[in-house]
Design a protein with these regions (language model features):
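Substrate-access "cap/lid" subdomains that shape
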Residues: 174, 277, 311, 320-430, ...
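Alpha/beta-hydrolase-fold catalytic nucleophile elbow
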Residues: 237, 292, 307, 318-321, ...
Length: 583
């Protein structure tokens, strides 16, 4: 009897713990987690009284599953600062009057969820963004509006990742809900200093996410720190994936501009137009706008620097961890013929022939569809938004920015390598040859691999240099012929993700204080320095300032290492870049 009791209680405890952990990571309501514990106690009493273990186990699984279902996290809009925040006064823009909210210490005004275009739904799906409608009454800009339609990240995996890397643990504990997403997503957010101002510089930030995922309100690029330093910070959502970058000759025929495949990018330009037309009402200077972005947002900045539609609409550019200026960009860009071919594969997958057939489908079905070419997540030379590849535009001197701050992280590609096949000493040379058929022999001389450990280590270096560093190198070299270029190399390690992809964001935008348990005094000092560099650049086109280590322009041939030490160095991957030039 004792063995039977021990076995049942052990099984009950184990299953309860597994369900509790799953529901916690899945962000189920706290009431659901409590109810599971109560149910486990009742099951224990039932077994103790009846000794009917089979029935008890069946009842346990049925009840646990039912509780898990009825306590699923609800979708809701994310508050701009906090629930019940104090409201600002009214501001009048072209569409009407609106109010925002103050942050907790009252030093920053936040205006969230301002429509910059009509909802791209129904017949407006896959069309250039249209002007927003007039407001009915006063718009309450106090919550972030839905993020763009995209494939939902598995909540359990997402929360587990946050906890594993000690990122956003507080968010996982507090936020027992799911942020809303919708095809109706064309909204922007503005952070500004409290009270009236005039002619403040503006940072126009484009979020990343491979052009398929992401949202405008992520904590790492929250704009309050910039607003406290007299810079207005704007970010926004735009169409993603197939809804934003699907190319179809029939859609080009529908367009008065003959465009297709660039709807998400045209959203970005539309948001920029709205900011230029209205930012003076918030105290901003429409003639001193810096466009900024990370990852796919950085690729978008790169495209905006060469788009004829963006000419004269911004002044400076900040680019972090992605560039499409190489002759053969490894991601985020493809030629129009390839884009149209990829678009056809989407129609084949969904059983549609014409745009009208696709417009009848739900946004969820389209966003969740993979083609044989993968997801639709690349910009293209549509002849309207981009008339040439960025490389061709820079070669011709046809770029828009007056100064450029650009760089990447030491381990930018490490996460992406987890999706690659395993590298060892036996397949190392073949993998290098496949990626760099002209220069692989020189690469193998620079980075030979006699052991599996050497193969893994060296392949990471080569992958990071080729996938992330090289595009920034080409961009820097071409741009520096005509303008000041400031290039960085981020190497800081910490308790979180260190110098992996997105690792620089909380430093550059002044947000390490949102997760103080991840950072020490050296991180705080680096954050203060990087934020000062970025803000100075947004104000003047030069990151240097009083008390900061000198950041030499790239024409010196060096980059600024941002790590445990801040110093000018030669790019450690420069020899690889010269080999990549041959491809």
């Amino acid at each position: 009897m004792r063995k039977e009791k021990f076995a049942f209680y052990s099984f009950l405890i184990l299953v309860t713990i597994v369900f509790e952990l799953y529901m916690f990571l899945n962000r189920n309501a706290w009431s659901g987690l409590i109810l599971v514990l109560v149910t486990a106690f009742i099951i224990r009493l039932y077994w103790k009284k009846t000794r009917k273990g089979g029935r008890a186990v069946i009842a346990m699984f049925i009840l646990f599953a039912l509780i898990s279902f009825i306590s699923l996290p609800k979708e809701k809009l994310v508050p701009a600062t906090y629930e019940g925040a104090n409201r600002t006064g009214k501001i009048k823009v072209k569409e009407g009057r609106l109010t925002g909210v103050y942050n907790k210490d009252g030093s920053v005004e936040v205006y969230a969820g301002i429509p910059y275009a009509k909802a791209p739904v129904g017949d407006l799906r896959w069309k250039e963004p249209k002007n927003p409608e007039k407001y009915k009454g006063v718009l309450r800009a106090d919550h972030f509006q839905p993020m763009a339609m995209q494939k939902r990240t598995n909540r359990v995996v997402s929360s587990a990742t946050d906890i594993f890397f000690y990122r956003n643990v507080t968010r996982t504990i507090k936020n027992r809900y799911v942020p809303k997403m919708s095809e109706d997503c064309l909204y922007l957010n503005i952070c500004k200093p409290r009270g009236p101002q005039k002619k403040l510089p503006v940072v126009f930030y484009i979020h990343g996410g491979s052009l398929t995922t992401g949202q405008a309100w992520w904590e790492d690029y929250n704009g309050e720190s910039y607003a406290k330093n007299d810079v207005i910070f704007v970010n926004f959502s735009y169409r993603l994936g197939a809804l934003g970058f699907y190319a179809d000759e029939n859609l080009a025929s529908e367009s008065p501009n003959g465009t297709t495949g660039m709807y998400g990018f045209l959203d970005q330009l539309k948001a920029l137009d709205w900011v230029r037309a209205n930012i003076e009402k918030f105290g901003g200077d429409p003639d001193n706008i810096t466009i900024a972005g990370e990852s796919a947002g950085s690729s978008s900045v790169n495209a905006m620097c060469t788009s004829p539609l963006a000419k004269g609409k911004f002044k400076y550019a900040i680019s972090e961890s992605s560039s499409i200026t190489a002759k053969k960009p490894p991601h985020s860009y493809m030629d129009i013929k390839t884009a149209i071919k990829q678009g056809k594969s989407l129609r084949d997958e969904l059983g549609a022939k014409k745009p009208k057939d696709l417009r009848k489908l739900s946004a969820e079905d389209i966003a969740n569809t993979n083609t044989k070419y993968g997801t639709l997540n690349a910009m293209t030379n549509d002849g309207y938004a981009l008339t040439k590849s960025p490389y061709e535009s820079y070669m011709a001197g046809e770029n828009n920015e007056k100064a450029l701050l650009t760089g990447y992280n030491k381990e930018d590609g490490d996460f992406f390598l987890l999706l690659e096949s395993k590298t060892d000493k036996d397949n190392y040379a073949d993998k290098i040859k496949k990626s760099y058929p002209k220069g692989y022999e020189e690469i193998l001389k620079l980075y030979p691999a006699k052991t599996d450990e050497e193969a893994v280590k060296n392949f990471k270096i080569i992958y990071n240099a080729g996938t992330f560093g090289y595009g920034h190198d080409v961009w820097s070299r071409l741009a520096s012929e005509r303008e000041p270029v400031y290039r960085y190399y981020f190497t800081k390690e910490n308790k979180s993700i260190g110098s992996n992809h997105t690792g620089e964001l909380p430093y550059a935008y002044g947000n390490i204080g949102k997760a103080p348990y991840l950072y020490d005094g050296s991180d705080k000092k680096l954050c203060e320095t990087m934020t000062s560099y970025w803000i100075n650049f947004a104000k003047t086109g030069n990151p240097n300032g009083k008390g900061l280590p000198e950041w030499e322009p790239y024409n010196s041939g060096k980059v600024l290492e941002l790590g445990s030490k801040i110093k000018m160095i030669s790019d450690p991957n420069d020899k690889l870049y010269r080999i990549f030039d041959q491809e």
